[in-house]
């Protein structure tokens, strides 16, 4: 399992970091078998596996449930679990209680929290021993206000993102996720931070990349963002399900090959 210091060492050696967002035991098991460096249990699970319209409906209980499953599937991978909306920003005492509960009950290596406003939370969480990954740029929990669009696209916005990135690092963040920002801006931020910067829709100049398991494998998704590359096609599973339906209806399944050979009814009838 990678450690924070090893991830920083990868950045210093210019070895790119791979990260995949996964939500359950079997996907986490596959991600670990593939040798991926990090797993993010993202609150995007709300739309991807729970069928919600957005991340707004995702609860702390949801994140703990899925975080535990991922840890069981990937016991030797660096796992980061999202703080869902409402888990940060109520009061510092509540925020830290939520963070501690998530961190302890999922056995995660770090938690992730969105936005530039959380620097005081990062400082306090770090002080009590909870590693925090920051998330800037497009932050899904704020799409109701910001919308799904490129962030940092003006001079002022870019300068603010650079400042925000420096602030979360200074507050103690162990890594930073940058989402949907211009690639040259992401590269500039990556160069000026000592912590690893993981990009999603932020070009190749970051220290690593993260994509969602379901997006990159075309597993049950209808719409994919511009920055998503499909590396395999799990949608072919629908063909298998159709064949199963046909064989059940025709009586072709189960054949003798899939049936136990043991016969018992003669013995049952002889007892009468």
Swiss-Prot record:
Gene Ontology biological process terms, A to Z: pantothenate biosynthetic process
Gene3D superfamilies: Phosphoenolpyruvate-binding domains
Subcellular location: Cytoplasm
Cofactor annotation comment: Binds 1 Mg(2+) ion per subunit.
Cofactor(s) essential for the protein: Mg(2+)
Binding site for Mg(2+): 43, 82, 114
Molecular-function annotations in GO: 3-methyl-2-oxobutanoate hydroxymethyltransferase activity; magnesium ion binding
EC number: 2.1.2.11
Binding site for 3-methyl-2-oxobutanoate: 43-44, 82, 112
Keywords: Cytoplasm, Magnesium, Metal-binding, Pantothenate biosynthesis, Transferase
Main location (coarse class): cytoplasm
Pfam families linked to this entry: Pantoate_transf
Active site annotation, chain numbering: 179 (proton acceptor)
Pathway terms, separated by semicolons: Cofactor biosynthesis; (R)-pantothenate biosynthesis; (R)-pantoate from 3-methyl-2-oxobutanoate: step 1/2
CDD domains: KPHMT-like
EC main group: transferase
Catalytic activity line of the entry: 3-methyl-2-oxobutanoate + (6R)-5,10-methylene-5,6,7,8-tetrahydrofolate + H2O = 2-dehydropantoate + (6S)-5,6,7,8-tetrahydrofolate
Gene Ontology annotations for the cellular component aspect, listed alphabetically: cytoplasm
Family, as annotated: Belongs to the PanB family.
NCBIfam families, A to Z: panB, PRK00311.1
Subunit annotation: Homodecamer; pentamer of dimers.
UniProt-listed HAMAP family: PanB (MF_00156)
Entry function: Catalyzes the reversible reaction in which hydroxymethyl group from 5,10-methylenetetrahydrofolate is transferred onto alpha-ketoisovalerate to form ketopantoate.
Name this polypeptide is given: 3-methyl-2-oxobutanoate hydroxymethyltransferase
Source organism of the structure: Staphylococcus aureus (strain bovine RF122 / ET3-1)
């Amino acid at each position: 399992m990678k450690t924070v210091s090893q991830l920083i060492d990868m950045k210093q050696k210019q070895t790119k970091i791979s990260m995949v967002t996964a939500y359950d035991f079997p996907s986490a098991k596959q991600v670990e078998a593939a040798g991926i460096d990090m797993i993010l249990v993202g609150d995007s699970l709300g739309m991807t596996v729970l069928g919600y319209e957005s991340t707004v409906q995702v609860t702390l209980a949801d994140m703990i449930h899925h975080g535990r499953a991922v840890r069981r599937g990937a016991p030797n991978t660096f796992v980061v679990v999202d703080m869902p909306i409402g888990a940060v920003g109520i009061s510092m005492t509540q925020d830290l209680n939520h963070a501690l509960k998530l961190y302890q009950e999922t056995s995660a290596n770090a938690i992730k929290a969105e936005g530039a406003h959380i620097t005081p939370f990062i400082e306090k969480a770090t002080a009590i021993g909870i590693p925090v990954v920051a998330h800037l740029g497009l932050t899904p929990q704020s799409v109701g206000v910001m919308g799904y669009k490129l962030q940092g696209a003006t001079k002022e916005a870019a300068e603010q993102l650079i400042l925000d990135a420096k602030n979360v690092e200074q507050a103690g963040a162990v890594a930073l996720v940058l989402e949907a920002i211009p690639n040259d801006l992401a590269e500039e931020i990556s160069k000026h931070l000592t912590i690893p910067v993981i990009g999603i829709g932020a070009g190749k100049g970051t220290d690593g990349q993260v994509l969602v398991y379901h997006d990159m494998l075309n597993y049950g998704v209808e719409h994919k963002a511009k920055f998503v590359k499909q590396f395999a096609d799990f949608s072919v599973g629908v063909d298998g399900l159709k064949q199963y339906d046909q064989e059940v209806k025709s009586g072709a399944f189960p054949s003798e090959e899939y049936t136990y050979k043991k016969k018992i009814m003669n013995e049952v009838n002889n007892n009468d």
